[in-house]
Amino acid sequence: MKLCVSALSLLLLVAAFCAPGFSAPMGSDPPTSCCFSYTSRQLHRSFVMDYYETSSLCSKPAVVFLTKRGRQICANPSEPWVTEYMSDLELN
C-alpha cells in the first residue's frame, strides 16, 4: 500500500511539473518584438548593420534595423529606402 501511494504521489508530482510545458499548442510562439510606430526619417545606410522582419502575429508589419551602436529602429516595410536597405544587406 505504501509503495502504491508513493508511486502515485511521484506520478502526480511529475505531472504537475510537466503540465505548464504543454499548455500552449505547438507552433504558437508569441511574437518576441513588435513595432507600434515607425521612424519618421531615413537612417544613414552606414549606421545599419543588419535587419529582421517582425512576426506576422504583430498588429503592424515592420522591419527592424540594427545599428552599429546596438539600437533597434522600426521602419515601414513599404518605404522605398527600407526595401533598398534590405536588398543591400541581403547582398552583403
Curated annotation (Swiss-Prot):
Family: Belongs to the intercrine beta (chemokine CC) family.
Source organism per UniProt: Mus musculus
Quaternary context: Homodimer.
Role of this protein: Monokine with inflammatory and chemokinetic properties.
Domain of life, source organism: Eukaryota
Chief location bin: secreted
Keywords: Chemotaxis, Cytokine, Disulfide bond, Inflammatory response, Secreted, Signal
PANTHER family: C-C MOTIF CHEMOKINE 4-RELATED, SMALL INDUCIBLE CYTOKINE A
Localization per record: Secreted
Disulfide bonds: C34-C58, C35-C74
Name the record gives this protein: C-C motif chemokine 4
Pfam families: IL8
A Gene Ontology cellular-component term: extracellular space
Signal peptide (UniProt feature, chain positions): 1-23
A GO biological-process term: immune response
GO molecular function: chemokine activity
Name of the encoding gene: Ccl4
Cited InterPro entries: Chemokine_b/g/d, Chemokine_CC_CS, Chemokine_IL8-like_dom, Interleukin_8-like_sf
